[in-house]
Amino acid sequence: MLIPSKLSRPVRLQNTVIRDRLLAKLASTANYRLTLVNCPAGYGKTTLVAQWAAGKSDLGWYSLDESDNQPERFASYLIAALQLASGGHCVKSEALSQKHQYASLSALFAQLFIELSDWHQPLYLVIDDYHLITNDVIHEAMRFFLRHQPENLTLILLSRTLPPLGIANLRVRDQLLEMGTQQLAFTHQEAKQFFDCRLVSPMESQDSSRLCDEVEGWATALQLIALSARQSNSSAQQSAKRLAGLNASHLSDYLVDEVLDHVDAEARAFLLRCSVLRSMNDALIVRLTGEDNGQQRLEELERQGLFIHRMDDSGEWFCFHPLFATFLRQRCQWELALELPGLHRAAAEGWLALGYPAEAIHHALAASDVSMLRDILLQHAWSLFHHSELALLEECLNALPYERLIQNPKLALLQAWLAQSQHRYSEVNTLLERAEQAMRDQKIEVDRTLEAEFDALRAQVAINAGKPEEAERLATEALKFLPLSSYYSRIVATSVTGEVHHCKGELARALPMMQQTEQMARRHQAYHYALWALLQQSEILIAQGFLQAAFETQDKAFELVREQHLEQLPMHEFLLRIRSQILWSWSRLDEAEDAAREGLKILANYQPQQQLQCIAMLAKCSLARGDLDNANAHMQRCEVLLHGTQYHRDWLTNADKPRVIHWQMTGDTTAAAQWLRQTEKPGMADNHFMQGQWRNIARVQIMLGQYEEAEVVLDELNENARRLRLVSDLNRNLLLSNQLYWQMERKSDAQKVLMEALSLASRTGFISHFVIEGEAMAQQLRQLIQLNTLPELENHRAQRILRDINQHHRHKFAHFDENFVDKLLTHPQVPELIRTSPLTQREWQVLGLIYSGYSNDQIAGELAVAATTIKTHIRNLYQKLGVAHRQEAVQQAQQLLKMMGYGA
């Protein structure tokens, strides 16, 4: 929950001086990207900007305190402030910030600016006390903010120091409005107005001017003079003498003598006790002081001018002036040292009662009360965990002595889950083992339910580490004892069980487990696991050969991403990548490439090493188009990423696929042989990951003429794929078997497996898998089409594949261009009939398409002419070639190509 007072613009104080000259300057704020009000404490920065902001509905206000150095907290409040300013316009950014579902602050701000692109009115964001920010991550994000904010959005920063935000650059480009100490110092006229409002007896102009000069227009000093004069019934001149030459660093003694010592003991104690609060309301005051009239007390102090401000229009929330707050806290530590821990405990209890556990934790830490901190964590830690307050939880757990943590095994479990959620996978087992050993040493008993929760986490760790047997045992054991109320651990254990079945190739068992995981995760709003379950379902359906069903499952996942604002999570890249894989399989290459590039955009906010699979996907798209240069450029990027990085074997398999295909297309046997010597040979090919790597190996073996070895590999792959019903893998394997048999001159076997592959492709929709095999595939498909033995659906697919090969790989059709024809006609062995009665360029094109297996309608579509025109071209070229039907024309074209040195 966000504290409302931090998002409320300060209410104008009574008797404030309206500073018209400065307000006139602020009137031009909308013309600048940044307005910076930068001067020491006590010059009236907040009061001035609050005057200017009065009546503006399109303005958000964010009051900082020390806790806002946590990037997640900073982001939540900043977005909330802009939501208030825009009337709730930035719904998606708000959801991302609340759930912490963004890759970085800059990525979140980028989304914010997208949403604000259709907000056309001026918009203002005030951030008060920016000097409290010391986190470089936030500074860097705010530099991004200033570079990219919309033209109609102005940022107003109030700070005691110059913020490290590239101010000089903004100044040079005239995008900065600055106001400093010289501008904010009170003028003689403003000082006169100030004293007239506060003193019973009016002050002469020359006296107020002299006082103003003596304190150099410092508003706080003027306020202290007036306060001291009222409290001691002395003249303002006498009070001023005490302040001569005084500045903010020497205020403490003065405030003791002239402020604290002039209030009664009860009021003094009230002020000191309240100082532990960064903001306060009646309920909190009652907790700290035991007085029932807290609100009345605060209002009375405000009337006395004791540096206390209302923080919102409702008048419910108050805070001390920053200078006075710092002074009071120092005095509290001095005068109430023994009472201070109890005050922080009372404050923590007050915040808990109001429903703000994060603020309560701040006070428990300040009290060094580990028992209270432990109790807060036991009650609220999992809620904070599910709201992604990971940094705060880590601070709390680090503050707890380990023996206290171990005495509460739930906190030991939380610590391990925290490491898991922060992707510190290598630490999780270490934390669990240490906790187990400590609990054994201290004879701490863990009940069976909690042990099951530990098992669920251990199962997740095991599957991440590639240990499916251990993961299955732990997940099964966990599900035996987990009650329905332990929903998170049940989701984890169910997900792991499904993933284990997936890894073992038990797809019929894996799919319902992942569907169950999705339903449970949606019911309990664990949307990360719901998305993960959908991704797993899609991969399982792809493996089963149901690519259309997988595509529709991905649509559900995209819908979940949009609804729950998961766009910036790495899992969104995973979704885009497997969408790209399906689109590539179907030869929708432009869409496949777009999806991979969208994935790279998401990964721009993460380590470059994570880009490997998307870049490999781009290489595959280029290979399917026959664009070897572009494919090579992508693969060089992959090589850079692979160098010196330890990747999971599944990642390596996906990166190796385009490499071995590229070596096949370019005939680079040297690189292929070196890779084969070095690559890891996986174990049993019981899932599509293992099948993929063994296919890479078999492809290289075929390239190197190691036909017997390749046949052994492919026979085993096909046997496993049939047994486990890995239909897509079987489809891919058969295409490699076809290439093997073709190279071995076993044409009958090659044709048999190709026909089975075409039949399976009616289910999978595969096209590009055929296309990348190039000319050898084209020749075989032409022969099958000419035999006219293929069923209609397979025949249509074969013609589509041929068209793609011709389009992307410039095979037979490309040979009948003008240069080829010129060389053909001057060849000494060219038939005399063709030499004396040459075909037109268009007729040569038609002959090439006939040879490629195109029907008349397809030729008409390819050349964008009427079907009747194509019939005329065919009749003419038959006459010139001296042939009577299509089969003879194909044979004639084949002979011409062979004569010119092209294999037929």
UniProtKB/Swiss-Prot annotation:
Description of how activity is regulated: Activated by ATP and maltotriose, which are both required for DNA binding.
Keyword flag DNA-binding: yes
Species assigned in the record: Serratia proteamaculans (strain 568)
Bilayer-spanning residue ranges: none
PANTHER family: DNA-BINDING TRANSCRIPTIONAL ACTIVATOR DEVR_DOSR
Keywords: Activator, ATP-binding, Carbohydrate metabolism, DNA-binding, Nucleotide-binding, Transcription, Transcription regulation
UniProt-listed Pfam families: GerE (PF00196), TPR_MalT (PF17874)
GO MF: ATP binding; DNA binding; DNA-binding transcription factor activity
Keyword Hydrolase: no
The gene coding this protein: malT
NCBIfam families assigned to the protein according to its UniProt record, in alphabetical order: PRK04841.1
Residues annotated to bind DNA: 856-875
Domain HTH luxR-type: 832-897
Function, in words: Positively regulates the transcription of the maltose regulon whose gene products are responsible for uptake and catabolism of malto-oligosaccharides. Specifically binds to the promoter region of its target genes, recognizing a short DNA motif called the MalT box.
InterPro entries tied to this protein: P-loop_NTPase, Sig_transdc_resp-reg_C-effctor, TPR-like_helical_dom_sf, TPR_MalT, Tscrpt_reg_HTH_MalT, Tscrpt_reg_LuxR_C, WH-like_DNA-bd_sf
SMART domains (UniProt xref): HTH_LUXR
Subunit structure as annotated in this protein's UniProt entry: Monomer in solution. Oligomerizes to an active state in the presence of the positive effectors ATP and maltotriose.
Family: Belongs to the MalT family.
Protein name according to UniProt: HTH-type transcriptional regulator MalT
Binding site for ATP: C39, P40, A41, G42, Y43, G44, K45, T46
An annotated GO BP: positive regulation of carbohydrate metabolic process
